[in-house]
UniProtKB/Swiss-Prot annotation:
Protein name: Probable DNA helicase II homolog
Gene3D superfamilies in the record: 1.10.10.160, P-loop containing nucleotide triphosphate hydrolases, PCRA, domain 4
Catalytic activity: Couples ATP hydrolysis with the unwinding of duplex DNA by translocating in the 3'-5' direction; ATP + H2O = ADP + phosphate + H(+)
EC number, UniProt record: 5.6.2.4
InterPro entries to which the protein is assigned, alphabetical: ATP-dep_DNA_helicase_PcrA (IPR005751), DExx_box_DNA_helicase_dom_sf (IPR013986), DNA_helicase_UvrD-like_C (IPR014017), DNA_helicase_UvrD/REP (IPR000212), P-loop_NTPase (IPR027417), UvrD-like_ATP-bd (IPR014016)
GO MF, one annotated term: ATP binding
Keywords: ATP-binding, DNA damage, DNA repair, DNA replication, DNA-binding, Helicase, Hydrolase, Isomerase, Nucleotide-binding
PROSITE patterns: UVRD_HELICASE_ATP_BIND (PS51198), UVRD_HELICASE_CTER (PS51217)
Domain named UvrD-like helicase ATP-binding: residues: 8-288
Similarity comment text for this entry: Belongs to the helicase family. UvrD subfamily.
Coiled coil: none
Swiss-Prot/TrEMBL GO biological process terms: DNA replication; recombinational repair
Pfam families, per the entry: UvrD-helicase, UvrD_C
Amino acid sequence: MPNHDFLHSLNEQQQKAVLHTEGPLLLLAGAGTGKTKVLTSRIANIIHQNLASPQNILAVTFTNKAAKEMQERVHNLVSSYGLNIGTFHSMAARILRDQIEHLNLGLNSRFTIISQDDQLRLIKDIVKLKNIDTKKYAPKLIHIVISRWKDQGLLPNKLSSSDTNLPLQRVAKLVYEEYQQNLLISNVVDFGDLLLYNNELFIKNPDILKHYQERYRYILIDEYQDTNVVQYLWARMLASLSKNICCVGDDDQSIYGWRGAEVGNILRFEKDFLNATIIKLEQNYRSTLPILAAASNVINNNKNRHGKTLWTDKESGEKIKIISCWNDKEEARYIAAEIARLVREGRYSAGNIAILVRAGFQTRSFEEAFINSAMPYKIIGGLRFYERMEIRDVLAYIRIALNQNDNLALERIINVPKRAIGAVTLNKIKLYAIEKNISNFAAIKEMLEDGEIKTKSYETLKDLVTKISNWHERFSFDAPINVTKAILDDSGYLEMLQEEKTEEALGRIENINEMLRAIAEFNDIHDFIEHSSLVMENESLETSYGGSVTIMTLHGAKGLEFDVVFLPGWEEGVFPSQRSLDEEGEKGLEEERRIAYVGITRAKKELYITHAESRKIFYEIVRSYPSRFLAEIPEEIIIRTSSIKKYDSFYKF
């Protein structure tokens, strides 16, 4: 019998989901319905009933933060040593390292994972080598096309004529072939390769697939509505033997179609897994009745969805406030003043209030309004730690020390600090490497030995090669923190920053020191490199909101909650986005409506929705009309008003 500690705090539907232990289960979890609690209780129950050991359970999430939270919650319920909880990418990387030789690609288990920035740099190099017109075919667009193909599970040799109908696609295919070859030569992979190669591995090696099918007897996938094709295929293959797969998601919160997420994955679950059980979690523990009514009435206008209706046993709360403003500046002034009033009256702290915008261009007017009102605020969406220049530089030094075939890492650090290695010499090295089909580092070594480099760069390159070789050897016996400090000193990188003596340089040194603190927690430098790569790709919001109002996009707010939420810019063309309507038609409209649903359900107690009669978009004043989504909210739960002059004076703090 299950431990009833897992059940006593769960409602009836949540209990059903926890006690379901055999066969496929689709858990349709509406916003704020306690899905994480159900997931962790379900894992704990499986372990407690001895249906599987922790090592035989695989739980997959989209972010490191979610994986860590799930791990901690399960551990608080039962002993769960050996439980496999992680992101799609981390789990796929683990399998690939163990089985990479079976793919016969030339990769070995010490491959590194390159960042988005390095991916783009490589594509730019290929575009330049092939003399492709970057005005017609921007490298960023080519990168997007290649990434989308990988999300669909398509390697260059699997692209059909329908995949290359457009001129951009035909150019992207040429670049894609060269791009993959460069990755293999450098013994690196990108994030798209991790799952793509996993699926290739399973298809070509049924015995390996069976091994993992037998190992992972219970599979749980969180945020299933956000899976792309290659993630979906990976999960389906792993679960096809035991059929004990539990997919948790909410088709009404599928808002990442632009990056490859396929809402159809959750809609066709019953076809993929016959005799599947579907359980709906509809009791909301977050929001008030009017907020839930607004969300439900908006999303009910979507046709392609599993029907469900959120409800709560909370007493009715504040009505939804819909405010009409003269223009976008007045809208920002009104919101800043209203927030100031709520905080001044002691009803809410600034940290429990959020402004959620549809598009980045909307934030500037709020910055100005908050500066004028002396209201503390924070715009979420700046550079993350591992995306900062100095951190990427140090990571590149570590990568080239570990993997001397990593062309991208070498290219990044070869003149940082400045070493006077000119463009002519660099180009000569690249051409030599291409001709010999070897890495750039190997090319430098051969050219130095053969006297191919006779410029003043000779001594500099010889010194760099020696240092990289020494660092490589030292990593085999010394602690990662010690070797990294040596790299910073020997390379002159730290000295370069110290000599700048600017506030910016001091900030960069502080960041490097923080990075060293992170490295000190790892015994194996490869584990740190993999950790940093996965964090860069999946890093979720770690910000403490303190006493600042949060300004962020609706996409960024998914999974968060605030006492008070302001939703500005609810006008046709802004929200729903005109681009989505033009490019995707009805499909785009339904995704926009799901974004609206996500925004509404972030609010716990009060919700404000504003729209402007005119808006400045890209330097042009445009007449605006209220969003069609506003007409989908019942009048009986709305208070309509207009912004007025009194909000021109601000409460000071």
